[in-house]
Amino acid sequence: MIIIPCTDRKRQVPGPKLLARNLPQGSIDNVAQNWAKIINSSSHSFNANQIYCGRPFAEALKAANACQAKLVVVSAGLGLVDMHSKIPTYGLTVAERHSDSVSNLVTIDSWGPSMWWASLKKTNVGTFDFSDYFEKNNPSLILVHLTRQYARMVYDELACLSSDKVSKIRLFGLGLEEFIPQSLVECLMPYDHRMNGPDSSNRGTITDFGARSIWHFVQLLKNKELETGSLSQHKKLAEGALSDWKMPVKPNRQRLTDEQVIDFITRNWSAVSGGSQKMLKLLRSSGNACEQARFKNLFHEAKKKSQVQLGLPL
C-alpha cells in the first residue's frame, strides 16, 4: 500500500458549493458537519484517479503500478481515499494562508489539523481510522509520504497504531521527526536532499520529494523477498543506493517577505504573461527565495490585487 497527501491540484474544477471558502464560519464541529452535508449531497462524482493530478500523484501512481500496490490519498476533506472510490471534486485544506483553509472558518474555540481530522471522523463523510483501514486491507508493506502539515493532521491516528502495524510502515518525508509519534520516528527512511543532487536522475521540488523517494525505493524492491524484508534491511537498502550521491549545491538566495514577493509578482506580471511557474522561475533566477506552496498562495493574492487595481472581476 502507498499513501500520499492530497494536493489542491485537481483535473476537475469544483463548483462553488464544494469550496471551503463558501462554508459558514463557526465551531470546528459545526464546520465539519456542514462540510459533510455538502459532500454527501453532491450529485456529481468521479473516480478518484480522474480528480487528483500533479507530479506527486503521477510519481506515486507509477510506483503503485510497478509493485501492484493500492494507492491511497490522505485528504483533508474526505479522509482516506483509494483510487477506485467515487468522490466529488472539492477544495479544502488545512494549510493556512489559503482561501479554502479550514483555519479561515473556525471562529469559535481553537483549531488545529488534528482537531479537524477528529471532527470529520465524527461525521459520515469518509474513512478516517487508520488502524481499521489497515486491518481490513492487511497490506504486507505500507509506504507513507507525509508533509509536516499532514503529519500534524493524522498524528493521533498514527499514535494509535499497534506495533505490528507500525512494523509495516516505511515513512518518507523531510523534517518530520518533531511532527510524528515517537513510535514512528524509527520508520523514517534515509531519503534526503540527495534526491535533488547531481547524481539523482529524478530531481524535482519539495512538494513531490516524498513521491519521488517512494518511486526510487520501489525500484529497489525487485523481488518478493525484499518486499517482506525488515525495516533495518530496507533502510540499509535505501542508504546503500544513496551512499555515493552528493547533496545539491544550495543557491545563495535572499528570502523575501510576503509583501516583497507580492510586489515582485505585480511588477513583473507582464514579463511572464501572468504565468505562475514562469514567475517563480524568474523570482528565483533573480536571486530570491520562496518555497513553492508559499509562492502559490502569494501569487493568487497578487493576482487579485492586480485585478482590483484594473477594475476587473475577481
Predicted feature locations:
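A structural signal for short, well-ordered beta-strand segments and their strand-loop junctions
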Residues: 2-4, 70-75, 82-83, 143-145, ...
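Positively charged, polyanion-binding regions of nucleic-acid-associated proteins
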Residues: 252-274, 286, 299-307
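A structured, charge-rich N-terminal accessory region that forms the first stable segment of a protein
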Residues: 1-50
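Basic, amphipathic alpha-helix used for nucleic-acid engagement in HTH/winged-helix/SANT-Myb modules
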Residues: 220-263, 308-314
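DNA-recognition alpha helix
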Residues: 276-288
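Long, charge-dense
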Residues: 77-130
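Glycine-rich, aromatic-bearing surface loops/beta-hairpins
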Residues: 167-240
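A charged, amphipathic interaction segment
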Residues: 125-197, 256, 262-266, 273
